[in-house]
Curated annotation (Swiss-Prot):
Lineage, opening ranks: Eukaryota, Metazoa, Chordata, Craniata, Vertebrata
GO biological process terms held by the UniProt record: bone development; bone remodeling; cell communication by electrical coupling; cell-cell signaling; heart development; microtubule-based transport; negative regulation of cell growth; regulation of apoptotic process
Designated name of the protein: Gap junction alpha-1 protein
Organism whose genome encodes this protein: Chlorocebus aethiops
Cytoplasmic side: 2-23, 98-155, 229-382
Database matches in PANTHER family: CONNEXIN, GAP JUNCTION ALPHA-1 PROTEIN
One cellular-component annotation, GO: apical plasma membrane
UniProt-annotated location(s): Cell membrane; Cell junction, Gap junction; Endoplasmic reticulum
Function comment: Gap junction protein that acts as a regulator of bladder capacity. A gap junction consists of a cluster of closely packed pairs of transmembrane channels, the connexons, through which materials of low MW diffuse from one cell to a neighboring cell. May play a critical role in the physiology of hearing by participating in the recycling of potassium to the cochlear endolymph. Negative regulator of bladder functional capacity: acts by enhancing intercellular electrical and chemical transmission, thus sensitizing bladder muscles to cholinergic neural stimuli and causing them to contract.
Modified positions (Phosphothreonine) in chain numbering: 275, 326
Gene responsible for this protein: GJA1
Disulphides: 54-192, 187-198
Molecular function (Gene Ontology), one example: gap junction hemi-channel activity
Keywords: Acetylation, Cell junction, Cell membrane, Disulfide bond, Endoplasmic reticulum, Gap junction, Isopeptide bond, Membrane, Phosphoprotein, S-nitrosylation, Transmembrane, Transmembrane helix, Ubl conjugation
Region (Disordered) location: 317-382
């Protein structure tokens, strides 16, 4: 048997990039397959053809009968099985090395951009693209490769192919040999002159090893299935929690109830901005709501609020008896909210409006009227 150290070193590197189930599968592969195959099994099948005897003196009869009974040796069959079930894992390891190589290139490019940034060059967009690529390849900040995206798909595909190869080799072994060996094999094949009986050496020992390798194959298949379900449900769980792609941006417009950072919004929808300036024409205590004119519901509400504000303003102007008011009647006309630049231009061209004091509209009592000697604007002159 050849040296397994090269394959063992390659598979050992996969340990750092596998799940718990993958690590157990690799342990089973190393201990119960490669190690056992290189020591006990090979010695048990070392004399399989030389100890295969038939009750005939015809030259070549034993060779053709052995070829009919064992088209391929059990040892070589298990070697092929180990190689085939290890190839998907090696392909996954190649993908990991590819991602690590991409990481080195991205880190080198990022360092060059940071050097250019210190010289005053605007490279924020390029740095952001590098971060997105790192997340796409599954590279974390500390340089560790995380299983997600294309790397996760490669891992799932490798598990599927390992399971397929395990099932295929079990079926082939059952079709060619069965899962037990007989002590006597009957052969009738040219150049044998007649039907001959051939005898196998150590059939019981070989049957025990066959059953043991069968159990190991079933255990490996079960580990692959468990790991497949584990990786699948873990991916679904991460996607539900929103951890799959933090750089993903929604294309739809934000709702006014969530976008509270804008300067124009409706505070009645659950947003409030303590930094938003009040309108210069509104008296203290009033809240003149503003909103996005493209939103029909906010626009209707703002028109009603503006009508009420203008009605309050005109009523106070009439009560104070100020002539030359900018409001000619007590019914304010609804208007749409212009931009801030238009408001400033209109205020500069017209009269500057003074803030109004809040007047108590409740009728005063007689006692308070007699007690107060101050003249009121609505008193009649005699």
């Amino acid at each position: 048997m050849g040296d397994w150290s090269a394959l063992g070193k390659l598979l050992d590197k996969v340990q750092a990039y596998s799940t718990a189930g993958g690590k157990v599968w690799l342990s089973v592969l190393f201990i119960f397959r490669i190690l056992l195959l290189g020591t006990a099994v090979e010695s048990a099948w070392g004399d399989e053809q030389s100890a295969f005897r038939c009750n005939t003196q015809q030259p070549g009869c034993e060779n053709v009968c052995y070829d009919k009974s064992f088209p391929i040796s059990h040892v070589r069959f298990w070697v092929l099985q180990i190689i085939f079930v290890s190839v998907p894992t090696l392909l996954y390891l190649a993908h990991v090395f590819y991602v690590m190589r991409k990481e080195e290139k991205l880190n080198k490019k990022e360092e060059e951009l940071k050097v250019a940034q210190t010289d005053g060059v605007n490279v924020e967009m390029h740095l952001k693209q590098i971060e997105i690529k790192k997340f796409k390849y599954g590279i974390e900040e500390h340089g560790k490769v995380k299983m997600r995206g294309g790397l996760l798909r490669t891992y799932i595909i490798s598990i599927l192919f390992k399971s397929i190869f395990e099932v295929a080799f079990l079926l082939i072994q059952w079709y060619i040999y069965g899962f037990s060996l007989s002590a006597v094999y009957t052969c009738k094949r040219d150049p044998c002159p007649h039907q001959v009986d051939c005898f196998l050496s150590r059939p019981t020992e070989k049957t025990i090893f066959i059953i043991f390798m069968l159990v190991v194959s079933l255990v490996s298949l079960a580990l692959n299935i468990i790991e497949l379900f584990y990786v699948f449900f873990k991916g679904v769980k991460d996607r539900v929690k929103g951890k799959s792609d933090p750089y993903h941006t929604t294309s739809g417009a934000l709702s006014p109830t969530k976008d509270c950072g804008s300067q124009k919004y409706a505070y009645f929808n659950g947003c409030s901005s303590p930094t938003a300036p009040l309108s210069p024409m509104s008296p203290p205590g009033y809240k003149l709501v503003t909103g996005d004119r493209n939103n029909s519901s906010c626009r209707n509400y703002n028109k009603q609020a503006s009508e009420q504000n203008w009605a309050n303003y005109s009523a106070e102007q009439n009560r104070m008896g100020q002539a030359g008011s900018t409001i000619s009647n007590s019914h304010a006309q609804p208007f749409d909210f212009p931009d801030d630049n238009q408001n400033s231009k209109k205020l500069a061209a017209g009269h500057e409006l003074q803030p109004l004091a809040i007047v108590d509209q409740r009728p005063s009592s007689r006692a308070s009227s007699r007690a107060s000697s101050r003249p009121r604007p609505d008193d009649l002159e005699i």
